[in-house]
């Protein structure tokens, strides 16, 4: 029986590497997968999943109004798994479409993304994945300032912490830092 998996972690926790690893393992066995990512994430190009260590692959970009269920249902070859990067940027309807892929097409879906934003609010996609996922796993990494587990994301601009502003601002290591709770409120900048 297929399931909807939600695997979340802070920045630099290896979410995209995990997607690429899972895809490789399926494909090594001759089992096709579909890799998708939010159309909002254009850091490394449109429709690209890219890890910070340099591994990258093309992916199907997901817009907020895309009918993911119909897209997967109409593929000529049924995938063995659907892998989603940057799932925090998905709309509520996108997440419900993923649940339908699992329930009606019997295709496992693994969604990877951030849980909370730099203000410690849930992203729309994260909120609905937490509600609908059959299995929820945390991908762990450590705080940039100490050896505790990072549970939050600190946004910085010009070396200063930022706690207000737009929820979505696509960035990389230079803008967002994985931190523990202590260093979120008292960063060593």
Swiss-Prot record:
Zn(2+) binds at residues 143, 146, 180, 183. The keyword ATP-binding applies. One of its GO terms (molecular function) is thymidine kinase activity. Pfam families: TK. The active site is at 86 (proton acceptor). InterPro entries: P-loop_NTPase, Thymidine_kinase, Thymidine_kinase_CS. Belongs to the thymidine kinase family. This is Thymidine kinase. The gene is tdk.
